[in-house]
Amino acid sequence: MSEITLGRYVFERIKQVGVNTIFGLPGDFNLSLLDKIYEVEGLRWAASLNELNAAYAADGYSRIKGLGVIITTFGVGELSALNGIAGAYAEHVGVLHIVGVPSLASQAKQLLLHHTLGNGDFDVFHRMSANISETTAMITDLAAAPAEIDRCIRTAYIAQRPVYLGLPANLVDLNVPAKLLETKIDLALKANDAEAENEVVETILALVADAKNPVILSDACASRHNVKAEVKQLIDATQFPAFVTPLGKGSIDEKHPRFGGVYVGTLSSPEVKQSVESADLILSVGALLSDFNTGSFSYSYQTKNIVEFHSDYIKIKNASFPGVQMKFVLEKLIAKVGAKIANYSPVPVPAGLPKNAPVADSTPLAQEWLWNELGEFLEEGDIVVTETGTSAFGINQTRFPTDAYGISQVLWGSIGYSVGAMVGATFAAEELDKAKRVILFVGDGSLQLTVQEIACLIRWGLKPYIFVLNNNGYTIEKLIHGPTAQYNMIQNWKQLRYLTNFGATDYEAIPVKTVGEWKKLTADPAFKKNSTIRLIEVFLPEMDAPSSLVAQANLTAAINAKQD
């Protein structure tokens, strides 16, 4: 085969970089393109329920496998996905957004086509996406198309940000040389400037040598930019106390003897707050300093000796080194740091949160008890997805087992995100290991925004755990403002009927109201195996919330009320 269609070329390239599932919806400008998916062995079309959910799913898939792909149609389809694409941009998630657009001939004639604004401007939606994309490409030249496609895939993967790729309907059936596929897309990072890298490493080593009480703080981009292994090696090499932020959950092994807990500024436990804020050197890896990730910007470091490691720059105190990538710096630091810490004596790390005190089995479930207890159910390698709201804050109280990974949209915070992200993560998990468990915690209110995507799971026989926290509405909103306001109320749905209504025949739907029911269920060996899709409705008091969320809600309300 000397030639292949441009459409097939796209999918062959996507498959080569490890993507096996593509999310999105069909539309008349992408139908010919979608035909080509079935020509590539090992690719599947998930058949998402709407474009927003598809974007969330591509985000969740990418957080597990490094790149997600969504395909939409021009105008109406692509715009429906943009909230999810914006979230991926904000949270550094690599998503390739492929849009089927009208033919070049139609564009040249400025035809008054459906899905347009009726003004002949065919580039308007492309321009909208440019603001939330690392780069974009609108293919107009067949000869240059393969290189542009390769550039888009590489950029999305390396930068861990969304990339927009517009493919005109008339080009996807035209042929390009098949031999181009023989040269794989180079996904390796380009080397740092040697002089700048050495200056950075030596400066950090000097700070390390002088430090008496250093700590390591791992954040979201340690996971996104693939330096989790280096962070672990740095902890092992130095024995410095190590902490994570809410967005960094899963970036450090929480069973590691030097793991100290979750740092969220004033919302941290007193022991964690003291340990981090009394440090005389902070090695901060992959920080995303958003309000919900920092306890409304309440970090109170006593030292100015802060080193920030980022994917494309390093900051040491007030000096920035643009273009110096953290992965290579961490590798050199690990190799050299031993000689600089010969006199360092490891300090104790904070103990984990105490276990729940014994209570009667008939005790109604409550948030504080639930999140402290959850660690007993979790297993190595679990993927835990938590919704914006009580779940995203409560999970910070749960100690993860080794290799567990947390997904939560703490920065963008789009309600309903977790359902789509769980779908994407479940596809990815199945591709990696069919026994790998994906566990979702979502509130009854948030679930109503994206619930239909559960049908996609059933269609493919996927088997996550869906814990629906039924606390009668938008608790996080009620805590911030309007606890009795009508706009924070929802119509209660029959949660336990979802699976059967979406066509499931092999499933479990289980209500849980008491401590005893929770313990019995989560201790059941059969329940611990992901042998079927499960929806567990967890009944909780209406205004019950993790203590950290109550505190955060008060901080958020205060910020919202500020006049200057």
Curated annotation (Swiss-Prot):
It comes from the Eukaryota. It is an enzyme of class 4 (lyase). Pyruvate binds at residues 28, 115, 477. Thiamine diphosphate binds at residues 390, 413-415, 445-446, 471-476. Pfam families: TPP_enzyme_C, TPP_enzyme_M, TPP_enzyme_N. GO terms for biological process: aromatic amino acid family catabolic process to alcohol via Ehrlich pathway. GO terms for molecular function: magnesium ion binding; pyruvate decarboxylase activity; thiamine pyrophosphate binding. It catalyses: a 2-oxocarboxylate + H(+) = an aldehyde + CO2; pyruvate + H(+) = acetaldehyde + CO2. Its cofactor is Mg(2+); thiamine diphosphate. GO terms for cellular component: cytosol; nucleus. InterPro entries: DHS-like_NAD/FAD-binding_dom, PDC/IPDC-like, THDP-binding, Thiamin_PyroP_enz_cen_dom, Thiamin_PyroP_enz_TPP-bd_dom, TPP_enzyme_TPP-bd, TPP_PDC_IPDC, TPP_PYR_PDC_IPDC-like. Binds 1 Mg(2+) per subunit. Its EC number is 4.1.1.1. Keywords: Decarboxylase, Lyase, Magnesium, Metal-binding, Thiamine pyrophosphate. Mg(2+) binds at residues 444, 471, 473. Belongs to the TPP enzyme family. Homotetramer. PANTHER family: PYRUVATE DECARBOXYLASE, PYRUVATE DECARBOXYLASE ISOZYME 1-RELATED. This is Pyruvate decarboxylase. It comes from Hanseniaspora uvarum (Yeast).
